[in-house]
Amino acid sequence: MKDPFFFGYGSLVNRATHSYAHAFPAQISGWRRAWRHTTLRPVAFLTAVPAHGEQIDGLIAAVPGHDWAALDEREHAYDRHPVTGPLHHQAPDAGDVQIYAVAPQHSDSPDARHPILLSYVDVVVQGYLREYGEAGVIRFFDTTDGWDAPIKDDRSAPIYPRHQTLHADEKRLVDAQLVRVSANVVAA
């Protein structure tokens, strides 16, 4: 029986944040990303939201032995859903593919009490840069809603548990894209 795969569209695109080695760039149709928060976490995070006619880049990776326990724990604020729409990838052996998304009735827009963490944005952008180059980073920003939410600048003392060290050019790229989308970056 083939291993199932997950479709990651945020921090899971950054291979440095997980150990799922059998991974491939992928695109899924019918979805966008949005910044949301729930009562399950003190800060905002990305979720996938249905969006007819839209497509987002991401990463699919095998879940060996159908063992979802560690990934479900990491993604505890999300529900796991089967991917039923068009999915494009080069994985020769992908079984069923699942996507994590927050149920709309359990989420709300980010606010000052539930900001987006810059250290989280850094991780996601680093992943997209490594998988898709600068064009992929631009597509990430363009296919994600909620950049008007407060972004807490925690870069010097990262709060995000899977934060990564960014090179100076990666930081400049993140900062330039945040300016381009008129993001609201606030001091920590």
Please tell me what each predicted stretch does.
Residues 1-188:
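A glycine-rich, hydrophobic/aromatic-adjacent loop/helix-cap motif
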